[in-house]
Swiss-Prot record:
<feature type="repeat" description="Solcar 1">
    <location>
        <begin position="39"/>
        <end position="133"/>
    </location>
</feature>
<keyword id="KW-0677">Repeat</keyword>
<feature type="transmembrane region" description="Helical; Name=6">
    <location>
        <begin position="305"/>
        <end position="322"/>
    </location>
</feature>
<feature type="transmembrane region" description="Helical; Name=5">
    <location>
        <begin position="245"/>
        <end position="265"/>
    </location>
</feature>
<feature type="transmembrane region" description="Helical; Name=2">
    <location>
        <begin position="110"/>
        <end position="134"/>
    </location>
</feature>
<feature type="transmembrane region" description="Helical; Name=3">
    <location>
        <begin position="144"/>
        <end position="164"/>
    </location>
</feature>
<keyword id="KW-0813">Transport</keyword>
<feature type="region of interest" description="Important for transport activity">
    <location>
        <begin position="269"/>
        <end position="274"/>
    </location>
</feature>
<keyword id="KW-1133">Transmembrane helix</keyword>
<keyword id="KW-0999">Mitochondrion inner membrane</keyword>
<feature type="transmembrane region" description="Helical; Name=4">
    <location>
        <begin position="212"/>
        <end position="232"/>
    </location>
</feature>
<comment type="subunit">
    <text>Monomer.</text>
</comment>
<dbReference type="GO" id="GO:1990544">
    <property type="term" value="P:mitochondrial ATP transmembrane transport"/>
</dbReference>
<keyword id="KW-0496">Mitochondrion</keyword>
<dbReference type="Pfam" id="PF00153">
    <property type="entry name" value="Mito_carr"/>
</dbReference>
<feature type="repeat" description="Solcar 3">
    <location>
        <begin position="246"/>
        <end position="328"/>
    </location>
</feature>
<feature type="binding site">
    <location>
        <position position="115"/>
    </location>
    <ligand>
        <name>ADP</name>
    </ligand>
</feature>
């Protein structure tokens, strides 16, 4: 990591050239780290949450288009013919802008930012805490053991944080999938969405699709963190001198790959979310998998996947931006990969 003096001398361009790879969080459970900086945990949360909030707001229009394409076969207004189907990414962008207004691209973004701050922050913060419970292996001499440790720590961190923020993720999906305009909107905002769904189906209605979400989050986060940390250890001899754009390219490939791999799980959970508090289209997770495959074909599990790849640019940006923010907050922190 750069020292405070070097940071002041180098400026932003020097920081980007000399930055360490990606989201390197400290081993918060390590006595050495916590004694050196008792605020390391708080700084971890602040850096990860800030980076996530910025990137999510930037890619919110792509996120909403992805959700509309992904859930339209479970959207009552579209299924009834009240609102015509979207035929693709471009068609969705054009119609949403003309029918609902440009500002509607950010429907559900508040819930997403509120959700994403603790989700991403806890993912990054607890990943290395969990990883600290496992033996440490070198990516050069014990590649597969190193890979498995990173895969497990990333997956467990994501699954744990999901339990806390799932109602916000649920609300984000329902708000983004609301194709009404003006008085025809189903929900007017985050609080209205949560209160109406609870009134219709009880508190557990906010956890529709949670089971398959846990499966998907383990697959996604496991690949997201595990592959990224593994790629860093294998591709970069000195992480501290890694090129900014090289970091971004690796992060982009990881987020795209992890997103496609876990996308069918995401489609199923979104479909289950859409029926909460209303008419039931599926009797459960297995029934949803079966009906989508039989009635719409396997490609239906990947509706909106291309939008998800584009949105992945924001995820890759988070991985790189996180480290830059963390170094600004805590210039003397030591990268976990360098220990």
């Amino acid at each position: 990591m750069l020292s405070s003096a070097l940071y002041q001398q180098a400026g932003l361009s020097g920081l980007l050239r000399a930055s360490a790879m990606g989201p390197q969080t400290p081993f918060i459970a390590s006595p050495k780290e916590t004694q050196a900086d008792p605020m390391a945990f708080v700084k971890d949360l602040l850096a990860g949450g800030t980076a996530g909030a910025i990137s999510k707001t930037a890619v919110a229009p792509i996120e909403r288009v992805k959700l509309l394409l992904q859930t339209q076969d479970s959207n009552p207004m579209i299924k009834s013919g009240q609102v015509p189907r979207y035929t693709g990414i471009v068609n969705c962008f054009v119609r949403v802008s003309s029918e609902q207004g440009v500002a509607s691209f950010w429907r559900g973004n508040l819930a997403n930012v509120v959700r994403y701050f603790p989700t991403q922050a806890f993912n990054f913060a607890f990943k290395d805490t969990i990883k600290g419970l496992f033996p440490k292996y070198s990516p050069k001499t014990d590649f597969w053991r190193f890979f498995v440790v990173n895969l497990a720590s990333g997956g467990l961190a994501g699954a744990g944080s999901l339990l806390i923020v799932y109602p916000l993720d649920f609300a984000r999906t329902r708000l983004a999938a609301d194709v009404g305009s003006g008085k025809s909107r189903e929900f007017t905002g985050l609080v209205d969405c949560l209160s109406k769904v609870v009134k219709r189906g009880g508190p557990m209605a906010l956890y529709q699709g949670f089971g398959v979400s846990v499966q998907g989050i383990i697959v996604y986060r496991g690949a997201y963190f595990g592959l990224y940390d593994t790629a860093k250890g294998v591709l970069f001899k000195d992480e501290r001198t890694a090129n900014f754009f090289a970091k971004w390219a690796v992060a982009q490939a990881v987020t795209a790959g992890a997103g496609v791999l876990s996308y069918p799980f995401d489609t199923v959970r979104r479909r289950l979310m859409m029926q909460s508090g209303g008419e039931r289209q599926y009797n459960g997770t297995i029934d949803c998998w079966r009906k989508v495959a039989q009635q719409e074909g396997m490609k239906a599990f990947f509706k909106g996947a291309w939008s998800n790849v584009l949105r992945g640019a924001g995820g890759a940006f988070v991985l790189v931006l996180y480290d830059e923010i963390k170094k600004f907050i805590n210039p003397n922190a030591v990268s976990s990969a360098s220990e």
